[in-house]
């Protein structure tokens, strides 16, 4: 069983999120001697393939079978794999059907592992991610079947294959700040309350501000402005309101309260000056605050924690063993970091599973003509096999 041949077959499935397009049936055929528990919810398919070989720890490989839409401009059919110049082209080649193919290959060949091996897959990662990995882990917890360790086979490498292992991810907080005043004729500014004028002197203290100093494992949490809009695009009418959208990526310890306090403080307010409420939905925290400004305008701040940060300790078993396997196969040590966006690894951490991420390079993910170097896929399967062999 060669990983590149498995990858070719996986690419052929048009598994646009949240559909698996039958890919799970193909995986089931390849792992015929594994027990399968398939779980469908609201159009999302999740599955875990499990094989108990001993009384030792449960090591799980995980990933998502769904892909983003291919878009226009491909040199070939994105769902018909094309091999050229040492690369394999197709949607999902890097993100992340290559990781799944390598894991399948390693799991199918495993014989001497002294515990339980599994592969957990979802078709809901690229989309909303509400009914995917988190729901499956919740189900496994109810059954008392949560894994002890997990490797999420996301494409983590940057410049060369083997250069990066993710041991955590920053959390993501989305914010919408709205200032509301009184619109009117630009010739009579004294009869208006212009929210843009109120925002302008404050904006510099918000844009790009570091909310903390960072740490060895996490870069500083920075306020990144993503959108500003207000008014009706008419030169002689002042706007009634202005809206600022922003995102904050932060490490363990940064919460909605920290973002709220800084934003309010920029307007010379504190928490007691605002009416705030909190709620939670599908494990995601939300906060809504309203306040009156001295200039006569009103302020509304909406914050949502779209993903929680996590960190696996550098001396944990999964990090140490995976690092050793990467060093052995690639001949060089991998950097341990937490950079980049979010992934389903955060859900494993939420359920107390020691987790690390490792996969192929990510230089063409979500792009047209997505491709993966064939040797990277082959070496990834070797790394996963070595990890299984030496995990005990």
Model-predicted regions and their roles:
Residues 1-71, 241-247, 259-262, 321, ...:
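N-terminal helical capping/dimerization or prosegment-like subdomains
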Residues 84-86, 106-119, 142-146, 206-215, ...:
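Phosphate-handling active-site elements
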Residues 277, 302, 306, 323-392:
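Zn-dependent metallopeptidase/amidohydrolase metal-coordination segment
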Residues 139-270, 284-289, 293-302, 307:
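Midchain, well-structured core segments that form catalytic/ion-binding scaffolds
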Residues 68-84, 151, 168-178, 356:
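Acidic-glycine-rich active-site phosphate/pyrophosphate-binding loop
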Residues 59-121, 376:
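Active-site metal-coordination/substrate-binding segment of hydrolases
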Residues 100-168:
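Acidic/histidine-rich catalytic neighborhood of metal-dependent amide-processing enzymes
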Residues 311-325:
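Short, low-order "capping/linker" segments at domain edges
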């Amino acid at each position: 069983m060669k990983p590149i041949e498995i990858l070719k077959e996986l690419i052929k499935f048009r598994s646009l999120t949240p559909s698996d397009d039958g890919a799970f049936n193909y995986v089931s055929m390849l792992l015929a001697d594994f027990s399968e528990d398939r779980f469908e919810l609201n159009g999302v398919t999740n599955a875990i393939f499990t094989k108990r070989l001993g009384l030792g720890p449960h090591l799980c490989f995980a990933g998502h079978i769904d892909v983003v839409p291919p878009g226009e401009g491909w040199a070939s059919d994105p769902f018909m794999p094309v091999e050229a110049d040492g690369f394999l082209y197709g949607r999902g080649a890097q993100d992340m059907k290559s990781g799944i193919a390598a894991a399948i290959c390693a799991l199918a060949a495993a014989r001497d592992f002294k515990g339980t091996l599994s592969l957990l897959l979802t078709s809901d990662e690229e989309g909303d991610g509400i009914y995917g990995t988190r729901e499956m882990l919740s189900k496994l917890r109810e059954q008392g079947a949560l894994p002890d360790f997990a490797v999420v086979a996301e494409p983590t490498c940057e410049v060369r294959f083997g250069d990066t292992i993710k041991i955590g991810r920053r959390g993501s907080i989305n914010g919408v700040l709205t200032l509301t005043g009184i619109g009117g004729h630009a010739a009579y500014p004294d009869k208006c309350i212009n929210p843009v004028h109120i925002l302008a002197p404050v904006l510099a203290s918000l844009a790009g501000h570091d909310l903390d100093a960072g740490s060895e494992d996490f870069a500083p949490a920075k306020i990144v402005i993503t959108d500003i809009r207000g008014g009706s695009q008419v030169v002689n009418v002042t706007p009634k309101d202005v809206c600022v959208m922003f995102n904050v990526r932060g490490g363990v310890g940064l919460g909605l309260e920290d973002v709220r306090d800084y934003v309010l403080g920029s307007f010379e307010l504190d928490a007691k000056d605002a009416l705030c409420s909190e709620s939670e939905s599908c494990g995601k925290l939300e906060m809504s605050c309203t306040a009156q400004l001295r200039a006569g305008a009103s302020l509304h701040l909406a914050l949502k924690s779209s993903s929680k940060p996590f960190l696996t300790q550098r001396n944990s078993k999964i990090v140490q063993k995976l690092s050793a396997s990467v060093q052995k196969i690639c001949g060089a040590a991998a950097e341990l970091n937490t950079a980049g966006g979010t992934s389903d690894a955060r859900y494993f951490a939420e359920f107390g599973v020691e987790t690390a991420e490792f996969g192929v390079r990510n230089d063409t993910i979500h792009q047209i003509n997505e491709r993966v170097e064939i040797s990277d896929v082959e070496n990834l399967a070797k790394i996963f096999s070595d990890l299984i062999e030496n995990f005990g």
